[in-house]
Design a protein with these regions (language model features):
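A short structural motif in glycosyltransferase catalytic domains
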Residues: 316-318
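Residues lining hydrophobic/aromatic ligand-binding pockets adjacent to catalytic sites
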Residues: 292
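Short acidic/histidine- and often glycine-rich active-site loop of Leloir-type glycosyltransferases
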Residues: 345-356, 361
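Short alpha-helix at the nucleotide-sugar/activated-sugar donor binding site of glycosyltransferases
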Residues: 328-330, 353
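Alpha-helical solenoid repeat scaffolds of the TPR/TPR-like class and their adjacent stem/linker regions
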Residues: 1-229, 241, 251, 279-287, ...
Length: 368
């Protein structure tokens, strides 16, 4: 068998959120990842002298940098795209450090046009990227990756800016000594649980940004018939990644289908093997397999438009919906969620509260 410590070292911090909502375990996992895979500050020498920077910053705009591999057609890019237009240009000078794949798309073009300085750093090693950020004189650098694919945590360990903030990309504490703040809200990090985060907690009313100008219509408009859904039955949907579907939540979905005759569960198409396995689990629970309907891949605009065909979005647990919940709420579909203890398990409840529908936040799995 594998002991708990070995398990923590073997699993990526982001993956752990699919299996547990224990914030202490998540912190330990993130901490171990930083210590073993990234390194500790004593191993890095920062050449920067920030002492004089504060004085020099008086009388000029605050320089804010966003470091991300996802400022493109990606869940994070969709959420953030509208935010860059809203920065107060008289107070802030905005830099984007893009560390993603070299693709061109509408979201990336929009963000690039909205920031004053766009830097491509994917091809730069840590030394070159560090030199670039230091030369730009960034005051606050926002790490929009955290423990996700495309992160440059090693670069952050070398302190490219006096203040480094963990926000949005990774739903949890970095467990690192090189992230000074985490942006949260009263729901994702409830007052009193700050001790489970190595960063200092800063709260907004809701931590997740959204783009109010996002294109949502599709031509032709989607229909239930075209989507393979029954015209007059209740359609429950969950467009979360299948890795978030746990036995705990699937069992409750099957109970809901048993209680709602004719109702269907509309999920995102995964690979054939996963779809068949889910239908097999449904059959084992006494539910006709065809009551699980799988939505094929679609463009983001088409995907958003088809949300309107659903009656209720059912959240997963312990790793809940984040961008997918926002999508549903924007398209007028209520979201049912049962919050857990950790950050990733509480995002959906935060969004549902922000949307003004707290009655859809369940107090227990039974209530769900």
């Amino acid at each position: 068998g594998m002991d708990r410590a070995a398990l923590l070292r073997a699993i990526a911090p982001l993956s752990l959120a699919n299996y547990t909502d224990d914030p202490m375990l998540q912190l330990a996992c993130a901490h171990a990842h930083c210590r073993e895979d990234v390194g500790w500050p004593s191993e890095f020498r920062s050449t920067a002298d920030f002492a004089g920077r504060v004085e020099a910053a008086r009388g000029r705009r605050l320089r804010i940098g966003y470091l991300s591999s996802d400022l493109r057609d990606h869940a994070i890019g969709y959420l953030m795209a509208g935010m860059f237009d809203l920065h107060d240009r008289s107070a802030c000078e905005v830099f984007a450090y893009y560390n993603g794949i070299p693709q061109e798309d509408a979201t990336k073009a929009r963000i690039r046009g909205a920031v004053e300085h766009w830097r491509e750093i994917a091809a730069l090693d840590d030394d070159a990227a560090l030199g670039l950020i230091l030369a730009d004189g960034i005051d606050i650098l926002v790490d929009v990756n955290g423990h996700t694919r495309g992160a440059r945590t090693r670069l952050l360990a070398r302190r490219p800016a006096p203040i480094v903030v963990n926000w949005l990309g990774y739903p949890g504490s970095m467990g690192s000594p090189y992230h000074h703040y985490i942006i949260a809200d009263p729901y994702v990090i409830p007052p009193g649980s700050e001790g489970l985060y190595t960063e200092r907690v800063v709260r907004l009313p809701c931590y997740q940004p959204n783009d109010r100008l996002r294109p949502t219509g599709a031509d032709p408009a989607p229909t239930r018939r075209a989507a393979g859904l029954p015209e007059d039955a209740t359609v429950f949907c969950c467009f979360n990644g299948t890795q978030k579907i746990t036995p705990f939540v699937f069992e409750r979905w099957m109970r809901i289908l048993r209680d709602v005759p004719g109702g269907v569960l509309w999920l995102l198409k995964s690979c054939e093997e996963v779809d068949l396995r889910l239908r097999g689990h449904a059959a084992a629970a006494g539910i006709a397999p065809e009551r699980l309907v799988f939505a094929p891949l679609a463009t983001n605009r088409e995907h958003l438009a088809r949300y309107a065909l659903a009656d209720l979005f059912l959240d997963t647990a312990p790793y809940g919906a984040h961008t997918t919940a926002s999508d549903a709420l924007w398209m007028g579909v209520p979201v049912l969620t049962v919050p857990g203890r950790g950050f990733a398990a509480r995002v959906c409840a935060s969004l549902v509260h922000a949307a003004g529908a707290p009655e859809f936040v369940c107090s227990s799995p039974e209530a769900y």
